[in-house]
Each structure stands twice: as C-alpha cells, then as structure tokens.
Amino acid sequence: MSRRARLAAHSAVSTSLAMCSDDTLHDLVGAAVPLGSGIGGRSALLDVDGTPVFVKRVPLTDLERLPENVRSTANIFGLPDFCQYGVGEIGGPGHGAWRELAVHTMTTNWVLANEDQQFPLMHHWRVLPDTAQSLPEELADVERAVTYWGGGPEVRRRIEALEQASASLTLFLEYIPQNLHEWLGEEIKAGDEAANRACSWVERALHAGTSFMNARALLHFDAHFENILTDGRRLYFTDYGLALSSRFDLSPEHARFFERHQTYDRCYTVWYLVSWLVTAFCGYGREDREALVGECARGARPAELPAAAQAIVMRYAPLTVVISDFIRKLRHESRQTPYPLEEIRRIIASKPG
C-alpha cells in the first residue's frame, strides 16, 4: 500500500473510531473476529467501514489505572531490570500497558511525519471495561513464574494484578496480515533465487529498522520474526510490550540498563536471523544449530545454505555464538546473567557490519 493510501485509510478509520462511545466501541470489539491470545493480551480483527483493523486488548491493571499512574511510563511495579528480556524460558510479566501505548504513539507519529514507514499505524486507543482473564499459559503457574523471575514480591504483585485486571487498554492498529516468519518461509520454498533475494533484503531491512529505532532512543527488546510484519515491500516492527526508551520515566538503575543495551536489538535480530536460516535450511534443532554456527565462527562454510544465507551466517556467526551463550545462561542459569557488552564491542570492532 502506498503512503497516500495508508494515510487516507488511517484518517477514515481513526475518525470513525473516535466518534464511537465507550459502549459502542466495547460492543464492536466484542463482535470482532478473535485471532488469538498470549502473554501480551488478546487480538481480534475488526471491520471499520470496509477497512480491516487489528485490535489488541492489553490487560490494564488496577494499579496502572490509579490517577497518579495513568499514562505513566515509570516502572510502576518496581520489577527488576532483567524482566525486560523476552528470551526467558518462561514468559516475563511485562512492564505495563502505558509503555506500549507510548511506543505506539511514538512510532505512529514517525510514520505520519514521514520520518519512517516501518511501523503499523495506531488508528485509535481506548480504555475499555473487561472481564478478568485467565493468566496466559506462561504465567498460569504463578509460583513457578515468580520463582523463575527472581522470587521478588514485585513480580508476584504484577502477575496477580494481571489476573485481576478488570479493564484493557484497547489498541486499534493498521492490519498487516503476514509476519516475517511466514513470509520468509514462503520465499525460501520458492527456490534459491527467491531465497537469496529475500535473505539479502531482510538482512538490510532489519538493520535499517533497528538502527532507526535505536537512534531515536527506542529499544524494541523483542524483535523476533513473529513480532515483525511484512507486505514483501517493507518490514513493520510491532508488539512493543517489552520496548524501552530513554524518554520513559526511568530510575537511575534502569537508565543505566538502557545505556548498556544500546546494541541489544541489533545483536538480537542478527542472532535470530542466523538461527532462523540454519533451522530453515538444515532442519536443525538448537544443539546442532549452535554447533554449526560455532564451526562457521571458526571459518567453516555452511554448504547446505544458498549463497546469500551462507554469507549472512558466515558474517554474523561470531556474534551469534556470543548471544546464544548469553541467552542460554539467562534462560537456564541466572536471570542476572550480565549482558556481554564488552565481547560484543570487540566482535563489532573486528568485523564491522
């Protein structure tokens, strides 16, 4: 879709939704076609005057609804900084709905100002009453989840508050039906020529997207391929439940965490791309995949991959090894595993790009 068409659809949909009362909007959302549910909330597809709209209902806890906390980007529950990571063996409790709204506002404004087009537009948002929902599977065993994420009372309070939430922050977003995982999977099935073209484009687009966000004080922190949408012409980074910005109301500790993780999005997307390519082309599980990437980091060529994918794996294998080790330790040994910034800097300095 062209920029002009996107903006025209956005104008029409946002105006239509803004005209709805809370009761009307609540009924519309209730009648929308359910798409799924997960740790970040529930989603549905809504038709607004012929335009499909993606609806995301993010649990809004009672604490977040207190007058002093409305629209606050502070760490209201006092969660430890390692809850920022989206790579735990058990899904994390998240840092709150208002941060997600703030990032959607930020990214939508970038699109409207024609600074960048790599984000879905937020047409509208509203706080709507909701019935308390069962916890997502990852958090359903509260004791296990609390223990995994450090055992602190702050984590317990956050998870229990999610379970008791009686409202949702309802986001009405531009609908882009295909994610990058699906699209790239189709491209590599179309033969080596299509695969080479797609892999090269995805590598460039991931770098462009993360660089743009990071240069504007935003770290996504969860940019895996199911959180990135595509129409085959550009990528659209979405799902900001773990996003972090220096423009948020951060404590000194979390401000330092933000500064230390300036390379995180770039490293995470590189790690994910390399891991995805080796899995897709070789059919390997984690252990075999990491063994192959380790061999590539020492100079071996992965002959099973077409040229573009092979070049990507070779280029980023050393960095992927470091990130794989970090994620393994974070998942299985300690949530307080330090981010390997110095090692990352050394690799980047020796092999730029």
Can you describe what each PLM-predicted range is?
Residues 60, 128, 178, 231, ...:
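Activation segment
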Residues 62, 108-112, 217, 273, ...:
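A generic secondary-structure signal for well-formed alpha-helical elements
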Residues 97, 102-110, 179, 205-212, ...:
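Amphipathic alpha-helical segments that form well-ordered structural scaffolds
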Residues 215-225, 230:
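Catalytic-loop of the protein kinase fold
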Residues 236-343:
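C-lobe/activation-segment region of protein kinase-like
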